């Protein structure tokens, strides 16, 4: 795995000032790797919160590279949904993005991404 992809919950927690989320993002960036998010994470983050906070959220998101949802990611997400029918499309896209790009997915969503699943990092649980 080379680099880190962040799930929506980690980014939203960091925006809310939750210290463990902020520390996890700092840790990833300080390792010299670039932090990445899927376009799906970008959508989920910007769909939450009050309009007055959108500027701050957009500025925070601009620190990350954004992986667009291309055909390869879409095909991988569809395959993941066939394998795991209960996996929702946004989560399948987020996981497919990390897997396709060869990155570790940093999340606290242990319902959809178990901590013992290869390629998953769960830094904390609420």
Segments predicted by a language model, with ranges:
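Short active-site oxyanion
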Residues: 31-34, 63-65, 99-104
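Donor nucleotide-sugar recognition loop
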Residues: 84-90
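Conserved glycosyltransferase catalytic-site signature
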Residues: 8, 39, 71, 90-92
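Nucleotide phosphate-binding site architecture
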Residues: 11-12, 43-46, 114, 123
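Short, well-structured N-terminal submotif of metal-dependent ribonuclease cores
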Residues: 1-37, 46-58
